[in-house]
Regions:
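Phosphate-binding loop of NTP-binding sites
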Residues: 1-124, 134-141, 145-146
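Adenine nucleotide phosphate-binding catalytic loops in nucleotide-utilizing enzymes
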Residues: 121-177
Length: 177
């Protein structure tokens, strides 16, 4: 919700009216209502910035074709909705695959978003930090295993939960540059 609000604020200054769902109505009925109640743009062009529920994305991308997806994070505290984080990520990928021309802007600090080949073009963002020696993350960190060899990932810097400058010491999997 914060990422959506910040993005809308920036784009509104540059382009005027933006279609968005600030109330958090992020499932198909809420997205539909957002478009039905949107003001008509003076330029005739509409820019939409939408926060979309993970499981709703495959349904929504049957009806709209985004030009950009932004993947920020998936944490284990979201498991009560759709089970394991890998299941949630697969739902997101299934939705993105229905718009294969759309670029995915993914948080490179999340090992999950760097774990699978996708049909979409991908760009990564993340913190540029000093390099430290890899070490096991704090016991409170959400343990993520290497998607290539299933070893426990280590972190040169752990910023929050499973995010940071990760590396697998058993194979070549690491945070994208």
């Amino acid at each position: 919700t914060l990422t959506t609000a910040l993005t809308v604020g920036i784009l509104k200054e540059a382009f005027g009216e933006i279609v968005t769902n600030p109330s958090g109505a992020n499932m198909i009925t809420g997205i539909t209502s957002t478009f039905l109640t949107a003001k008509k743009a003076k330029s005739g062009k509409k820019i939409a910035v939408l926060e979309i529920d993970e499981a709703s994305l495959p349904k929504i991308t049957e009806y709209i074709t985004p030009s950009l997806f932004v993947f920020t994070n998936i944490f284990r505290d979201q498991m009560d909705r759709y089970g394991e984080i890998y299941t949630t990520y697969q739902m997101i990928l299934d939705g993105a695959a229905k718009a294969p021309e759309a670029t995915i802007l993914a948080n490179g600090d999340s090992p999950l978003f760097n774990s699978k080949e996708v049909v979409n073009p991908v760009r990564f963002y993340g913190f540029d930090t000093e390099k430290h020696d890899p070490e096991l993350a704090h016991y409170n960190t959400e343990g993520i295993v290497c998607p290539k060899c299933e070893s426990i990932l280590q972190y040169r810097l752990n910023t929050y939960a499973n995010l940071g400058d990760y590396v697998c010491l058993n194979c070549d999997f690491h945070r994208p540059e």
